[in-house]
Regions:
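Structural signal for hydrophobic packing residues in well-ordered secondary-structure cores
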Residues: 97, 101, 116-123, 127, ...
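Residue-level signal for inorganic ion chemistry
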Residues: 72, 108, 130, 152, ...
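Terminal low-complexity tails and localization/encapsulation signals of metabolic enzymes
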Residues: 1-78, 110, 114, 164-189, ...
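ALDH superfamily catalytic-core signature
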Residues: 234, 251, 275-416, 438-447
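Conserved glycine-rich beta-strand-loop-beta hairpin in the small C-terminal domain of fold type I
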Residues: 365, 404-405, 424-430, 449-452
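Rossmann-like NAD(P) dinucleotide-binding subdomain of oxidoreductase/dehydrogenase enzymes
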Residues: 164-311, 436
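A structural signal for short, well-ordered beta-strand elements
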Residues: 65, 79, 101-102, 134, ...
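Glycine-rich loop-to-alpha-helix module at the N-terminal edge of alpha/beta enzyme cores
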Residues: 73-163, 173
Length: 452
């Protein structure tokens, strides 16, 4: 049963353009922000969930608070859906599947292309929304919007190139034909660190193949998901093809279980922690779902004695400090040959010192806050453990004077394998430098990770 008229959301009114006073109001933590005033297209700001093409409130009429990690500002009160709503979203996707799968590839590609164009046209607003709820600098957010849009563009074209095959038959009087068809209803559970790109990377191939999808965005960053879903609607994506199920951390656990255990859902894609990935895999096992799990990372960065040190430092800066180190593919362990160790540490520290910390909406800021208190506490534990076991603090190593969840970009030298930071994913702006002498040994060290 789908949403009744009483559960439909209220259409936002057109509001004035941004003024300095509007911007300053965003930093007043005592009141709910007026985000539409910051946007050229205020309709992008959505607080209700999307099921079967309708913007709905939660069936239990509950909401959860979304905060700006840079200021503590209350941004939005988003619909806090429950398991009944999750079942409704799955049903909507199931009903929409036949018609969407039945459309010719060119039609699906055309709708997706229109969606891509709308994302580009609203890129500035989408970047503002992302910076507000996630904290990353505006330039990084804009880059992610473009990166996320590229998935839609790519798979819009690939939709027209889904081809089967006619392999040689083992029987002379028979012909073997291989057809590629949409698997069915898909689920995407997405992270907060890349709240647009990780959604489009999952939605776009599913849509191109003819699948419908239910998306459960991270509770910290639902506004970006709702905004791009609105643009999908505007592009002509039929009702039920994309469904957004928003929920807080408590409801998310129960909703995740429903999505995993539903026999209607044929494929589940998840980007997040290894711990949660294990749970989702176990919950999906009874229905033998296809799974795509992108879990934790602990990537090594190796600098040999014949390396161009300036180039190595430049690469390290991009790899380590993007998104305040909150990236599953960023470098977490810096193995540096003893012959170039000191000069590398010196130059890396100098480059790190130039990073400007602050609100991602402010001019010139290159590192925003960590997403929440839990994140910054983990960074503090890793740094404290390393120093207690003999690591040398070169720069940073503490919370910023800005307060909140800002943490100074940090370089540690003299790190060794006894420290948690070498075996666990820190997910923060800390570069631990580990000296090595033997090339064969460092390759073994680089590969000695439970994360692969």
């Amino acid at each position: 049963m789908f949403a009744t008229q009483e559960r439909l959301g209220i259409t936002l009114e057109n509001l004035s353009v941004t003024t300095q006073r509007d911007y300053e109001a965003m930093n007043a933590p005592e009141s709910l922000a007026n985000i539409p005033k910051l946007l050229k297209n205020p309709s992008l700001f959505r607080e209700d969930a999307l099921i079967n093409g309708q913007w709905i409130k939660a069936s239990a009429n509950q909401r959860f608070l979304v905060r700006n990690p840079a200021t503590g500002q209350h941004l939005a009160l988003v619909a806090n859906l429950n398991t009944a709503d999750a079942h409704e979203a799955i049903q909507a996707a199931e009903i929409a599947l036949s018609a969407w799968r039945g459309r010719i590839a060119k039609e699906r590609a055309g709708i997706m292309r229109q969606w891509f164009e709308l994302i580009l046209a609203n890129a500035d607003d989408l970047a503002i929304l992302m910076t507000l709820e996630q904290g990353k600098p505006l330039a990084e957010a804009k880059g992610e919007v473009m990166y996320g849009a590229s998935f839609v563009e790519w798979f819009a074209e690939e939709a027209k190139r889904v081809m089967g095959a006619i392999p040689s038959s083992t029987w002379g009087d028979k012909r073997t034909i291989v057809l590629k068809q949409a698997i069915g209803v898909c689920v995407a559970i997405t992270p907060w660190n890349f709240p647009i790109a990780m959604i489009t990377r999952k939605i776009a191939p599913a849509m191109a193949a003819g699948c419908t999808i239910v998306i459960k965005p991270a509770e910290q960053t639902p506004l970006s998901a709702l905004a791009i879903a609105y643009l999908a609607q505007e592009a002509g994506v039929p009702d039920g093809v994309i469904n957004i199920v928003t929920a807080d951390s408590e409801q998310s656990i129960a909703i995740g279980k429903v999505l995993c255990e539903s026999p209607t859902v044929r494929h589940l894609s998840f980007t997040g922690s290894t711990e949660v990935g294990r749970i989702l895999m176990a919950q999906s096992a009874p229905t033998i779902k296809k799974l795509a799990l992108e879990l934790g990372g602990h990537a090594p960065f190796i600098v040999f004695d014949d390396a161009d040190i300036d180039a190595a430092v430049a690469g390290a800066m991009v790899s380590k400090y993007r998104n305040a180190g909150q990236t599953c593919v960023c470098a977490n362990r810096f193995y540096v040959h003893t012959k170039v160790h000191d000069i590398f540490v010196e130059k890396l520290a100098a480059a790190t010192k130039s990073i400007k910390i602050g609100n991602g909406l402010d001019q010139g800021v290159s590192q925003g806050p960590l997403i929440d208190q839990q994140a910054i506490e983990k960074v503090e534990r890793h740094v404290a453990d390393a120093i207690s076991k003999g690591a040398r603090l070169v720069i940073g190593g503490k919370r910023s004077s800005l307060g909140g969840t800002y943490y100074e970009p940090t370089v540690l030298a003299g790190v060794n394998s006894s420290m948690h930071i070498t075996t666990e994913e820190t997910f923060g702006p800390v570069a631990p430098v580990i000296p090595f002498d033997n090339d064969e040994d460092v390759v073994k060290l680089a590969n000695s990770s439970q994360f692969g």
